Amino acid sequence: MARSLKKGPFVDENLFKKAEVAKDGEVIKTWSRRSTIFPEFIGKTFGVYNGKEFIPVYVTEDMVGHKLGEFAPTRKFGGHGDDKGKK
């Protein structure tokens, strides 16, 4: 279910402030996976925490409006079962 338009997009205030003062090429570490990507974030790199490590996410124009957490998966896919003994 989408967020109500009257509420507007959500972004963590601290994250927005960090992004404003960050230099180009600097990785901005964040735990706020729920924050919406704003147009001001284009060209910046965020280190999004996935529960184990910070995944670098370089923001492009296509990502605006999505959440930061969408680009840092939390689960590792081990693949489907291998049939090692089967011929």
Swiss-Prot record:
One Gene Ontology biological process: ribosomal small subunit assembly
GO MF terms, alphabetically ordered: rRNA binding; structural constituent of ribosome
The keyword Ribosomal protein is assigned to this record: yes
Signal peptide feature range: none
Pfam family, one: Ribosomal_S19
Entry GO CC: cytoplasm; small ribosomal subunit
Record keywords, A-Z: Ribonucleoprotein, Ribosomal protein, RNA-binding, rRNA-binding
Cited InterPro entries: Ribosomal_uS19, Ribosomal_uS19_bac-type, Ribosomal_uS19_CS, Ribosomal_uS19_SF
UniProt superkingdom: Bacteria
PROSITE patterns: RIBOSOMAL_S19
NCBIfam families: rpsS_bact (TIGR01050)
Alphabetical list of HAMAP family matching this protein: Ribosomal_uS19
Annotated function: Protein S19 forms a complex with S13 that binds strongly to the 16S ribosomal RNA.
PANTHER family hit by this protein: RIBOSOMAL PROTEIN S19P FAMILY MEMBER (PTHR11880), SMALL RIBOSOMAL SUBUNIT PROTEIN US19M (PTHR11880:SF8)
Similarity comment: family membership: Belongs to the universal ribosomal protein uS19 family.
Name recorded for this polypeptide: Small ribosomal subunit protein uS19
This protein's encoding gene: rpsS
